[in-house]
Design a protein with these regions (language model features):
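Conserved, well-structured ligand/cofactor-binding cores
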Residues: 1-184
Length: 184
């Protein structure tokens, strides 16, 4: 159970090898819904919020129209998916996804619970986005890998899917559709 607090290394390993299914606990879902509502209330009020309805960097004072917000977020993901080189092992990607889901389950990011549901649905369905080992940007060093992960979640790029014990490459939208998952 992913709750934002009690995830152990043993649980991460079990989920990554498929011996344990991960799901979002109801308390985390409630915290996430409250956090998301706070973001939506701010946006509904017309307030300008950096990175949600503005440009970035030098364009931070440019208000983006409501009809372009989804495109803004997708373009941000695409622009940061700039890794190179060999890809990470799919099991390691599944570990990364499980840990990210746990972090988001704390309920302080304003993200929709459905995004974490998709992350965990991908993990449980053994769908690992293709993430290059080399490269990142920003102070945290995780923007490129997380952007590659998110590319899979929006149905773009390539994923590895475990089929009969072997990892095979598929385009992300096909992998999601075959698993009955909707991209965000």
């Amino acid at each position: 159970m992913i709750d934002g607090v009690n995830l152990t290394l043993e649980m991460v390993k079990a989920v990554s090898v498929g011996s344990m299914q991960a799901s979002l606990c109801s308390d985390s879902r409630k915290r996430m819904q409250a956090s998301r509502k706070a973001v939506e209330d701010i946006l509904d009020s017309g307030e300008v919020v950096y990175g949600i309805n503005t440009g970035f960097g030098a364009l931070s004072s440019v208000r983006i129209g409501d009809d372009q917000l989804e495109e803004l977020q997708s373009n941000l993901v695409r622009s940061h998916a700039c890794g190179i080189g060999e890809t990470m092992e799919p099991e390691h990607v599944l570990m990364m996804m499980t840990i990210r889901a746990n972090s988001l389950a704390k309920g302080v990011s304003g993200i929709r619970p459905s995004v974490v549901d998709l992350l965990l649905g991908m993990v449980n369905s053994r769908i690992a986005p293709s993430i290059p080992r080399i490269g990142s940007l920003g102070a945290s060093g995780d923007l490129a890998p997380l952007s590659h992960m998110t590319m899979g979640m929006i149905g773009e790029g390539e994923c590895f899917v475990e089929v009969a014990g072997k990892w095979v490459s598929k385009d992300s939208i096909t992998a999601l559709q075959e698993a009955g998952l909707e991209p965000v």
